């Protein structure tokens, strides 16, 4: 796995590596798996929790940009350890347009290297690191952002997609 920390202004494009296999429940109904997305580009943006200020901002920004992702032929999915019940309330409250995947056991989050120790007010706990992955139509991760700062992030993902798909 190519794990890197992406800071503002750095190149998120990585040496391609295989997206881990997954099969997760989707807020849109049914399950979404790596196999079901074969032949399609997709973006997975991982965030710590529904209904928290920064995660809400990030989800709303990705949702507003969904038509731009669709115009590029790219599927967009939010991913957190929240269950489908939490996702349904979150989607309804903010009018989110993209599906959210529920990784309650953090299997994919961990496989992507985005589950780890965090600290809040001196208290240590395990949680999801905000990160984003661009997966191509062959199932390879072509770009990744780690420890994401939300300001300007959606635009950076779209810019990278334009470059990769050119």
Where are these regions (language model features)?
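Chalcogenol-based redox active-site neighborhoods
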Residues: 1-166
